[in-house]
Amino acid sequence: MWPDRIRTDVVAAIRAAGIEHPWEHQAAVAEHALDGESVVVATGTASGKSLAYLAPVLSALADGAEAPNGRGATALYLAPTKALAADQRRAVRELAAPLGHAVRPAVYDGDTPVEEREWVRQYANYVLTNPDMLHRAILPGHARWSSFLRALRYVVVDECHTYRGVFGSHVAQVLRRLRRLCARYGAEPVFLLASATASDPAAAASRLTGVPVTEVADDASPRGEVVFALWEPPLTDLRGEKGAPVRRTATAETADLLTDLVVQGVRTVAFVRSRRGAELISVIAQERLAEVDRSLPRRVAAYRGGYLPEERRALERALHSGELLGLAATTALELGVDVAGLDAVLITGYPGTRASLWQQAGRAGRAGQGALAVLIARDDPLDTYLVHHPEALFRRPVEATVLDPDNPYVLAPHLCAAAAETPLTEDDLALFGPAAAGLLPQLEAARLLRRRATAWHWTRRERATDLTDIRGGGGRPVQIVEAATGRLLGTVDESAAHTAVHDGAVHLHQGRTYLVRRLDLEDSVALVEEASPPFSTTARDTTAISVLETETEIPWGDARLCYGSVEVTNQVVSYLRRKLITGEVLGEAKLDLPPRTLRTRAVWWTVTEDQLDGARISPEILGGALHAAEHASIGLLPLFATCDRWDIGGVSVPLHPDTLLPTVFVYDGHPGGAGFAERAFHTARAWLTATRDAIAACECEAGCPSCIQSPKCGNGNDPLHKRGAVRLLTRLLSAAT
């Protein structure tokens, strides 16, 4: 039963929605919330997490509606994506309809029309937004939100497991700024967090919010049967770089499976990691469906970030209504959007973490029925390892969430933003963590902050929130513009522009293919024109690295395993053209893009001459053995840290000028680090053991994309020595303590 303190009209509204009794975990969450305890519910997909926090929230809002101003209590809902916030507003409106005007939900994001925003600030009592809008609009404009913040009872943080790495670290500081302003207005909101099944969710939630958090993790909801298949695409007759065998692409396999399922009337979502992949799967499936039935292609579409608001909303409506049978989607749809009636989920490549894998698989069968989930392996070391070692997916707990709010590159701009919101005092510093006090003199020296009497003030005319992009991209977005018409097709982060919209890149939008004619980094514009090239493109880069500081190290025999600060210089130098469907390399074109410098954290290991002799590594094969070990270790790291292989980079050199030894580096791809390299350091033995095993188990002769070749290698995957890498890692691990 619901706690007695939940209003009877709220309980009646829940029953009117067809829910007679809560599950135990839902009642437990409500009890903690009513007691004023911040709580995280970390149960499976479709376990009713939303209702668990909505019951106390709606009860508080209905109580507050009886206050003289009609807004004695408010609640703030934070979602990582616009799609999830829009879906939650729909769900809240339906559930709270019997309560009349007591609950007034409203979305406040970049798509909200200007004329609606004032109404939201003054009258809405349940505001649904995202961390970006909180950072850029609500907190800097807190004076206009004073009545809302003064009454803030609950802050709901949905899908909190997604707040990891640099993005999670930024969100942690945004939430600390929110708590500081709430305290100024006399409020101390309770945090209600919802997470996918996670490792130690209470610790992760506490690190995110900065307050003690209780966890509810015992899932009492019934589950339909899910059949989970691991699918490895077949080898083709094609040969890749250095004559390596090539498998059929995961994209082509997914498109075929999506086609077959749609023909059978099976409602299916195919998750793919890239915008381009989502568009490509949609296009291929539509072409193949047209051969079967001309009415079917319109029932398949792509859904990804970067669409204009009206396009995104139309797709969401079509999916909810059942008008669409098949959807190729990026993670914009992964997160909690309630798509009732899905029968199957196709996952195109391992999504980077077990938490995301189960989150995506859980989208099917949400009405309690049985469902199908299929993981289609990409031709890379991690995916190949997983389809041959299913116990790594099904018998291991989900990963710990990695974030580092004390990262100075993250913390410094938020101290400036906080000072701009209201002057920063000594008493505030504890809220922002132990690194805050040490950063203030640097911010004063940079003339960003000025100390007057007992507080630090923001000194500039520009907005302090413009100092950082909390998604970690950095810089202003690059606009993708159709040259012939001037039409804006979408945007891409500046950090991704070098690889995504370089000159000659293929860009897909809503099923149409465009070629990038010119990338203007100065004006942040990529000019494109519609075309139909028979290929896709993949950027390649080169990297150099120098050690700034070794923070900690441990001996592995005569070798050393180290962690510390490094400076990385990276340059996109060329791109490959690959044949559609087969992935066959058609050619490589040079690029002239400026190098970029990054100060970050890295893990690295060295080997000595004696160890090389013991592993039978001659000077002729040393570079190839190190290079192969570097590629494979980057590919396997997502099993041990909540990262994507594109979040990290690597460098290997037979003689590094700072270590004076053969050295392999793996570094975080974000300024100041993201916590991934540190996690790699602490799990190094298990991580490198899995790396060695993955290379050794691959059936290829001399290396292939499934083990040691990397799609982004700027050296053309040369040199690589598969057997040398296995011997080298075996020798290194035998000396590990």
Across the structure, where does each feature detected by a protein language model lie?
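Juxtamembrane regulatory segments of integral membrane proteins
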Residues: S706, N715-G716
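Extended Lys/Arg-rich polyanion-binding regions
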Residues: G370-A373, D379-F394, D404, Y409, ...
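Short cysteine clusters
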Residues: C698, G703-C707
